[in-house]
C-alpha cells in the first residue's frame, strides 16, 4: 500500500520517538524528508542526521536531542497543509510559531525553508508544518 502523506508519517515518527525518549529513529528517505531533516538539525531540534543508502530508496537516521534533565527539545509538531486541504501563504502572510520560538516549514520554489528564511527572501509557498 502506498503512503498518502509521507511528511505526516515523518512527523508522526519523530513525535512518537520523542514521546518515549528514543535516542534515534529511522525512516524511509525522500528528497523533501532530507530537506526537513536538515532544517531540524540546523535549527537545533535534533542532534544529527545520517543518510544510509540501500538498494531501494535509502534511510534517514535521526538522533533526537534532549535537555539536561532529559526534557524534550521538540515539544510539539503539527502538520498544516494536508493532501485534502493545501495551505499556501504569501511572504508577508507567513505565520510566526509561538511568536518566533518555533518554526514553520514552508515548501517554496527554492526548496523547503523555515518561515524566517522565506520571509527574508520574500517568497511564499505551501506551509507544511509547525514545530516548536
Curated annotation (Swiss-Prot):
**Record-level Gene Ontology MF annotations:** rRNA binding; structural constituent of ribosome
Role played: One of the primary rRNA binding proteins, it binds directly to 16S rRNA central domain where it helps coordinate assembly of the platform of the 30S subunit.
* Record flagged with keyword RNA-binding: yes
Q: Which Pfam families match?
A: Ribosomal_S8
- Indicate what this protein is called per its UniProt record: Small ribosomal subunit protein uS8
Q: How does it assemble?
A: Part of the 30S ribosomal subunit. Contacts proteins S5 and S12.
Sorted UniProt keywords:
Ribonucleoprotein, Ribosomal protein, RNA-binding, rRNA-binding
Gene3D superfamilies, A to Z = 3.30.1370.30, 3.30.1490.10
The record lists the organism as: Macrococcus caseolyticus (strain JCSC5402)
Amino acid at each position: 500500500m502506498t503512503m498518502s502523506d509521507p511528511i505526516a508519517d515523518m512527523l508522526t515518527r519523530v513525535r512518537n520517538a520523542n514521546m518515549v525518549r528514543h535516542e534515534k529513529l529511522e525512516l524511509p528517505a525522500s528528497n523533501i524528508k532530507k530537506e526537513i531533516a536538515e532544517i531540524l538539525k540546523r535549527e537545533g531540534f535534533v542532534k544529527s542526521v545520517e543518510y544510509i543508502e540501500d538498494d531501494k530508496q535509502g534511510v534517514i537516521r535521526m538522533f533526537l536531542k534532549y535537555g539536561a534533565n532529559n526534557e524534550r527539545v521538540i515539544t510539539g509538531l503539527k502538520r498544516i497543509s494536508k493532501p485534502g486541504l493545501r495551505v499556501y501563504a504569501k511572504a508577508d502572510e507567513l505565520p510566526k510559531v509561538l511568536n518566533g520560538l518555533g518554526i514553520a516549514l514552508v515548501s517554496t520554489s527554492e526548496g523547503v525553508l523555515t518561515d524566517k528564511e522565506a520571509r527574508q527572501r520574500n517568497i511564499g509557498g505551501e506551509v507544511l508544518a509547525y514545530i516548536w
